[in-house]
Amino acid sequence: MTPAVAAPPPPRSTNPVVRITEDLRRERAVGVPFPPGDTRFSMARTMGFLRDPLTLLLGAYERYGPVFTLRVFHQNVVFMLGPAANHYILVSDAANFSWRDGHYHDLIPFLGDGLLSIDGDFHWQSRRAMLPMFHRERIAASQKLMVDEVEAAMDRWHDGMRVDVYAWTRELALRIAMRALFGMDPDRATARHDAAHEFEEALGFWSKDYILQLMRGPGTPWARMQAARRNLDEIVYAELTRRRASGEHGDDLLGLLLDTQDGDGLTLSDRHIRDQVMTLMFAGHDTTTSTVAFLFYELARNPGLADAADFDLDLAVDETLRLYPPAWVGPRRSVAPFEFAGVAVPGGVPVEYSSWASHHLPDVWDEPFAFKPERFAPGRREQLPKGAYVPFGGGSRTCIGMRFGQAEIGVIARAILRRFRLDLEPGYRMHVRQMPTIGPKHGLPVTVRASAPAAGLEPATALVA
């Protein structure tokens, strides 16, 4: 009998009362002080964390330094900010921090045991199985597909047309993922509608107020998310069954996972494949869509930048990811006690780093709230300290789809800039939502203007060398 892939530990209860009670029990069991900070419950602080966590975290950094405690929701959380803190958590002492026990655990009921929510051998084994799909050569081969999809979508644009770039990119990114990663035909109406509708329905759970997320029962956001998950499962499992029956697994991510065997003869179960599919759809979908929207928001706020002779789109994308890193917080739980920057941190407590806050520290970045792509120019990027710039995480947990996402963002942005300028709708104000990733809360409504190509743009197909 073929042995199964290494199994993850069982997830915690999805009952919010049980989970909150367990969190409080674990906190009482710590028995030693938390780092300095604001450790008494405050509704104002909790609401501030929900509405504007960046301001809250930067203020605490000024008061307490790079390691501090904030009581948000029902428990104390240790935050560690700055380049050295990021490097410590992501690279030098990464083994002392559990992902599965951080608050990304909240995603397990939808995503399952994908790369975001697993640790140890199970994470390493799963990541190794998928790495070939994200080699540079495979991504380069996917670029023509990306270009075809983008050009077809843009052929419907015309001068003076109003477009929500965020919504437009969400549809486009889903089509690209369906074709490039999963070999599914997005023009098969049932597949496209079902996948897109159910995926958006599921993600809508995390956009609801926190109190609504805690509710259970018919008609609640939780019930709608679970129904969407079941419908998505039917789509994925049906495709896996079809491929196994035909004997043709395909040359995409699904086929790669179906064919996977490691040196010990371990294979991946359908459930494991499903969990990785959902996780990659979630991570890649929101990263691409939000970054493209924020990029064109900043270009519209800085008129003439894209027309400058020295404009470099890659630098502009890097700067966009600095200002708006999609995965803005990295939740963990410490395995054992440790000391950082002279501050003792207990074992068994929530510990989080924040790329968003670290990317806005004035002692690291000149004019941290300004859009300045030149800060990533050759010679300047190398001067950044380790851990200063971490939009895709770092170490063994660096986003596996980073190159695919960068290629996709580049193809979409180059195609737009070669044909159009996007002007913000009068009176538009950007409101950033934080959950489950950073994105424009109210989309990005623009007016499309026909334009000469922006300066310095190489063809999209030259992006991946």
Predicted regions and their residues:
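N-terminal membrane-proximal hinge/A-helix region immediately C-terminal to the signal-anchor transmembrane segment
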Residues: 2-125, 144-152, 187, 228, ...
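Cytochrome P450 heme-thiolate monooxygenase catalytic core
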Residues: 2-12, 16-31, 99-104, 122, ...
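Cytochrome P450 proximal C-terminal region
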Residues: 2-12, 18, 30, 61, ...
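Conserved cytochrome P450 K-helix E-x-x-R motif and the immediately C-terminal K′/meander segment
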Residues: 45-65, 238, 310-343, 362
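Cytochrome P450 catalytic-core helices
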Residues: 287-307, 403-420
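Conserved cytochrome P450 K-helix/beta-meander segment immediately N-terminal to the heme-binding cysteine loop
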Residues: 353-381
